[in-house]
């Protein structure tokens, strides 16, 4: 039950997110018009904005709402925390924020937020249109695939965001690429029942009954109240009725073990981190190089490049 409640919060619920964001903005207006109750109202505004993100982290306006409140409160450490959280969902290294510690977040914090969302939209349809029209400053499909192979998707929110992105890749006809990327995401977070379900449906359309059954079986083990495995078996049995061929039987224990071994092997591969020894001199040189580049980008106002330093 606890796991079910946690998953409910991790899956976007747009209506609740929009409701809390609207409530947060109302409290912000009250705070700006009544100085005597400013702290009370702005406190409620911040709490509501946090709830908006909690219920729907895929709505960019929810992030903007909380960031605006952090600016009003002059809570720049809090703004950094918001950006770190967003970067985690976008599959980017939160330590990139630490590399920007010299940035004046009072002046450039909101611009950095917009730059991150402009380059990596949370809406999967917007992201897919952007990939298809990729220019020099926008990530291509090849770049996205390369990035997926080296990022950590253990954050369930990142797993959901990227899972919906690769669904757009599947819908465009790249089925083999979808399977590869889906297995990578599931290796990071096997509890993503939505992605298991989509993978099972794809295998079913490809007439790969064993693989489809294994995926549906995993979904039903994660969500016992669903009947996707049983429904699939009923559909499969219905197709077999009246045919001379031998009826389909469930995958053998060996087949199931092979499937699980593949996922374990992939999980080990994606979680392996190479230990690289870096000399003190090279660290200082890299830090100095970043500082020089940071100053140039700030002078040019190039915020899109800032998030990739």
Role assignments for model-derived ranges:
Residues 60-72, 202:
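Non-membrane alpha-helical segments in proteins
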Residues 1-32, 36-37, 81-177, 217-305:
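Intrinsically disordered, low-complexity, charge-biased linker/tail regions
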Residues 307-309:
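Conserved small/polar residues in nucleotide/adenosyl-binding loops
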